[in-house]
Amino acid sequence: MSPSSHKPLILACGLPLSGHIMPVLSLVHGLTDDGYEATVVTGRAFEQKVRDVGADFVPLEGNADFDDHTLDDLVPGRKDMAPSFDRTVQDVEHMMVATLPEQFAAIQRAFKKLSASGRPVVLVSEVLFFGAHPISLGAPGFKPAGWICLGVLPLLIRSDHTLGLDNDRSPEAHAKKLAMNHALEHQIFVKATAKHKEICRELGCTEDPKFIWEHSYIAADKFLQLCPPSLEFSRDHLPSNFKFAGSTPKHRTQFTPPSWWGDVLSAKRVIMVTQGTFAVSYKHLIVPTLEALKDEPDTLTVAILGRRGAKLPDDVVVPENARVIDYFNYDALLPHVDALVYNGGYGGLQHSLSHSVPVVIAGDSEDKPMVASRAEAAGVAIDLKTGLPTVEQIKEAVDSIIGNPKFHEASKKVQMELESHNSLKILEESIEEIASHDFGLLTKSDEETEDIPVKGPALAVSS
């Protein structure tokens, strides 16, 4: 559809990591197809993908311009750290908080460009793009008509009863979670929280932000969680701006089948294995999965390496019943798949279940344990509770998924639930609601500035 001058403009933002920006781009693709004009702020590694969905591109600068494969350069000592909570804390401080000024500056550059139209601009960001926070806190600069935040991770907002870990509502669990809630803000993320407040003040904010993990949930005009209710633990007192929106829309893409595509179509059983794009060491999961399934009768294993040009190590022998490809269209393969073995990314779970495919999860970094616990509670997964599963663990889990119809039945229910939530429609309704209210056109705050400076001191996060 041709762009419409009657629609509000869209400014979308996301961390330059596949699991964060790709869900945003999927929705932007739908918006541009429906006649919206969109601009996207993210890292240069994703510029072509931004342009491919019909959007204009504004790059992040400086340390904010990282990607999936350069994080070890951004976070001191990261490459020598095993996946752990300590590494997550370091990632938050350096990847999300310290880069906030550069993110905010990029948003302001984009707003300045869009302001000439005189049309309302709606800001759409993902939950960990903290550069959107100062806009809700009185910082000087251009303001959008409103802010919509997208939940591309399991819910991070705290609750007296869940903490996002399980559905246990016993008195003992309640006390434990209250203590953990306090520890998250006042011990574990105390340095990141302090730096977050300091940076916001340096940028001219007139209010302090909420707790670092929760500000986006509370301050956004609309918060759209990209999952169905069944993939979250029950919660008390969710904010009034919160809504479950289902998974991101599917888009038709050109598909050129590989030479072995006939093997997929003729196989009695197809198992897909991938490790995504972020935490990638193929000997952690892909290689043991190939080994675990090499003698399974009537089974074809398809391994997707997740990056164009990627290859398995030279010493890996690919079994006869396996096919390995660097990059592949999930939507083309998943309709033929009986089970997915992967490392627990949030988007991968949604993608798999949109095709009613149950999963085996082997992940212990980032948000992957949270994803796995939700998937297992929903009955659509087996959580191996490790990022380094043995061949035997993988084989037993795949056999259980294939041999017990309850997993496919539960996956089908979630698929139907996902289909009942049209995320693009929900987003467009939210955009139009915001644009139709009397928020005014894109304006500057009282303290007008031509350019928002990136202050040097705010970029330094002490070790």
Swiss-Prot record:
* Signal peptide limits: none
Which reaction does this chain catalyze? 18-hydroxy-(9Z)-octadecenoate + UDP-alpha-D-glucose = (9Z)-18-hydroxyoctadec-9-enoate 18-O-beta-D-glucoside + UDP + H(+); 17-hydroxy-(9Z)-octadecenoate + UDP-alpha-D-glucose = (9Z)-17-hydroxyoctadec-9-enoate 17-O-beta-D-glucoside + UDP + H(+)
A molecular function (GO) term: hexosyltransferase activity
Query: Which InterPro entries does the record associate with it?
Result: EryCIII-like_C (IPR010610), UDP_glucos_trans (IPR002213)
**Keywords, A to Z?**
Glycosyltransferase, Transferase
State the conditions that upregulate or repress this gene.
Induced in early stationary phase (at protein level).
Which EC number(s) are documented for this chain? Answer: 2.4.1.-
Q: What does this protein do?
A: Catalyzes the first glycosylation step of sophorolipid biosynthesis, the coupling of glucose to a hydroxylated fatty acid to give rise to a glucolipid. Can glycosylate all hydroxyl fatty acids generated by cytochrome P450 monooxygenases CYP52M1, CYP52N1 and CYP52E3 into their corresponding glucolipids. Main products are 17-O- and 18-O-(beta-D-glucopyranosyl)-octadecenoic acids.
In the record, the note on similarity to other proteins reads: Belongs to the UDP-glycosyltransferase family.
Designated name of the protein: UDP-glucosyltransferase A1
